[in-house]
Each structure stands twice: as C-alpha cells, then as structure tokens.
Amino acid sequence: MRRRRSRVEGAARALPEAVAALSRCLPAGPSPEIFRRAKFDRPEAAPVLWQLLLRVLSPLAANNTWTDLAPEAQACVVKSALGSQGYPRSVLLQFPDGSSQGSRELLLALSWLLARGPLLEQLLAQTRVQLGDQLPQWEAPTSPGPPAPFVEPKSPVDLRLVEWLMGRLRFRWRCLISSQQEQCILLSKIHLYTQGCHSQQSLGHLSVAETEMLRDPESGQQLLQALESENIRLEAALEWRRRELVFWQWMDTVLDTCSPETPAVTSQPTFLPEISEGGLGELESVKQELQALQEELREVSEPRRAAWEARVGGLGQGPEWSNSRKALQEAVQQELAALQGSWEQSSTPGQPQRPHRLVRSKDGAPRPQGLQAAEVIRTLSAKEACLKKALHQLQRQCQQELARLAGALPGLIWILPPEH
C-alpha cells in the first residue's frame, strides 16, 4: 500500500516538474499554473500564452521589437505564423483578435510546435551567449527541387511596382554588403591590435566581447549573468528531455477535454449534386455531341498529319543535321556536367553548417583545425558562377521568347530595357 501511494505521489510530482522545466526553457516562460489553467480554458491564461507564442514564432519578438504591439496585433501575427506553418486546427483562427478566449487552443498550438520540430534547440541557439567573433551561420542549398507551378495573378501586376521593389531590394542589398565590409574592417583592426593577448595559443587575439570586458569591467558582470542564465536554460532543457513523456501524456488528457464541436482537424463539408431524370437525358445528348466532334476532328487532322509527315520525311538526314545534332548533344552534356558539379559542391560535407569562430592567422603559420576563409570564398565563388550561368541562360530564353512574340505580331515594336 505504501509503495502504491509513493508511486502515485511520484507521478503527481513529475508533471509539475516537467512543466516547470519547459517554462524555464521558453523565453519569458509562464508559470506551471498558467498551463494548468489553460487546460480548463480559463481566460486569465490566454494573454500570457499569446505573448509566449509571439516570442516563439517571431524572431523579432526576442529583441522586444513586437512585444509593445497591441493584443489584437499580436494575435494577428501569431495566427498568420501558425497558418503559414500548416497548423491543422482552424478553431484558433476563428477566435477574435485580442480576446481572452481559447487558452486551451493556445496550449494545443504550443504543444504542436514542440512536437513538430526542434523548437527548443532553435530557441537555445537564438539566446546563446557569443564569446568569440563568429562567422554567420549559412547552409548550402542542395537540390532545388521541381520548379514551383505558375500561378496566374488575380489582378494585373504593374511593371513599375515590380521595378520599384527591385530597386529597393538592390539598395538594401548594397547597404547590407557595405555594413558587412565595415564590420570586417573593424574586426580585423581588433584582431590585429590584440594579437598575442589571448591565453590560448590557437586563438592568439581577443574577440569583441573580450575586448569590451577589458574596456568596461561592468560589462564582464553582465556577461557573467548572461552565462549563468544560459546554463540555467541548458539544465532545464536536459531536465525537460528526461520528463518529456509525462508532459505528452498530460497533453493527451488536454486534447480529450476538447468539445466535439471543435474536432482536431476540421474539413469542409462535401455536398453531392442531385441529378434529375431530365438532367440524365441532357448528359446523354452532350455525350453524343462530344463523340461527333471527336470524329470530325479526327477526319480533319489525319490528312494534315499525313501531309506534314510527307513534307518533313526527307529531313533529319545529311551533314547539316548531323552537325546540329552533335552540337545539341555537346550542349546537353555540358549542362549536365555543370548541374552535377553544382550538386557536388552544394553537398560536400566540408561546407559550414554551424557557426565558426573567426581567428586571424599569420602567413606561413600552421593552419588550425577549422574552416578557412579561403574555402568559404572558393565555395561562394563557385556558387556565384553557377548562378550567373543560369541567369545568362534564362536571359537568352527570354530574348528568344521576345523575338518569337515580335515575329508573331508584325505591327508591334518591342523595345528592350537598357542593360544595367
């Protein structure tokens, strides 16, 4: 009897500990009491969960950029983010923006985000304290996949608007490049001036954070507090992984408390049309008309096809056709070789898939273990060459299409835009 009672008490303590560990992992995580109230759909838990989902779904909210928004705007951002990620429950989207309803649905949305991907790992990576100057994380694209299907726009697109958007994009891209160049110059100066000041021989120089600690000792205390907070989050993540099963068992009970009027996956009702007896006769007459049209089309197309085959029957032979066929085969082989080369370059394991610390090394010194800047530049240059080649090919295709359209419309003059 005592053993059974202790087992029940242990299971009762495991759930609050699991929820508390999850709360410590999340940014500005709510208390476990909020989770308990959300299970019973209490209205006081809804505002806290709206803010939590905003911080989880929006990278800008981590910097307190969107936390000052009105509750209606926060709810709109959360709904659009969940919809873009394919959230299956439409019940949450039906609640009015900024209302205190649907705390249980918000809890289900949070659990869906936790179950579908490495959410905690991404949040921990965003709040990680950086002690060294690191190379920004980037991922080499692998196979681009099939092209996206063409979607006809609902309204005509103004060409001036497209040109204006392209101009804004180019301007922001140039601003980004100039800021990156300025940052690289400042980093190089710091690494050069602090050469030989680091205790580790493999590094040799100080980073920006370490230089800031020497310049302002109070920032060292802030950095220490940030490291302690990060350790607390990492310990909470480890505890969450040990007690995760208890939380998901509890979420099963939360899902069971949902009313039958709000099923897990809503679907549009299907209506079958009713066909009367008169409609069957009309369908039969339409079928006969279609068959007659098919026979007429076959009678017209067969003579034309025979005449076309007789006209081109002697073509495809001779030295000119063999030379053109050989040129086409060589072009196809070159294109396949270029595609294979870009695939091999994008799938090499030596490319950076995580942040790397920037270390200044002297000429002729032994290379440390890590990623060299020359390798990154070489990879990016090869990728740039492949993209430029694809761009030139698309431009040629567009020019050929414009020439074809100009030939089809003799009364229209096509004026190409000036090259930039």
UniProtKB/Swiss-Prot annotation:
Primary location class: other
What do we know about how this protein assembles, alone or with others?
A: Interacts with TEDC2. Found in a complex with TEDC1, TEDC2, TUBE1 and TUBD1.
Task: Please list the coiled coil stretches.
Answer: 276-340, 377-409
Record key words, sorted = Cell projection, Coiled coil, Cytoplasm, Cytoskeleton
Region annotated Disordered, chain positions: 342-369
User: What is a biological process (GO) this protein takes part in?
Assistant: positive regulation of smoothened signaling pathway
Give a Gene Ontology cellular component term annotated to this protein: centriole
User: What Pfam families does this protein's entry cite?
Assistant: TEDC1
Q: What is this protein called?
A: Tubulin epsilon and delta complex protein 1
Q: Where in the cell is it found?
A: Cell projection, Cilium; Cytoplasm, Cytoskeleton, Microtubule organizing center, Centrosome, Centriole
Q: Which InterPro entries match?
A: TEDC1, TEDC1_dom
Role summary: Acts as a positive regulator of ciliary hedgehog signaling. Required for centriole stability. May play a role in counteracting perturbation of actin filaments, such as after treatment with the actin depolymerizing microbial metabolite Chivosazole F.
Query: Compositional bias of type Polar residues: which residue ranges?
Result: 342-351
Q: Which gene encodes it?
A: Tedc1
